[in-house]
């Protein structure tokens, strides 16, 4: 899932969610698509085109399209950045549940999101990759988990102290 939603303006929500299958010549399972659209909270928008959706709704359509795919490795680039706090938490929970048996590479600029969702955290900086945290289950961590706040603080300290921390 790219940071930009990459929705097709001429296609409605259901057609956009089925895009991967259509590109593979499989047509797409519209029943499954409608179930996934319901899971992301957009049932009432399923026949709308992207230009009539908000940025957060568009991002949820892109997430629904990703949820439709049964791949062993999932790449998510800032998948929750356009969402309000409540919807972000709900979509993080949904993604964590749906992708629990898959390898997920999550790109985020949000240390709280990384601590809540990730088993391993790596910092990409100055063309290098550094492992900075290995976390234990459960995932996703509860948003009121006090240990999560301590881990987030520790992560921010490590980010600030890392080489090249100057902007």
Model-derived features with residue positions:
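Conserved beta-strand-loop-alpha-helix hinge in the C-terminal portion
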Residues: 126-156
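A short, proline-enriched helix->beta-strand linker immediately N-terminal to the Walker B motif
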Residues: 68-72
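Conserved ABC ATPase signature
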Residues: 49-53, 57
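Catalytic "switch" loops of ABC-type ATPases
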Residues: 3-8, 101, 110
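Helical segment within the ABC ATPase nucleotide-binding domain
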Residues: 88-100
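Short helical segment in ABC ATPase nucleotide-binding domains corresponding to the A-loop/adjacent helical element
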Residues: 14-22, 30
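Conserved ABC ATPase "signature" region
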Residues: 28-45
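Hydrophobic anchor residue at the start of the ABC signature
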Residues: 63
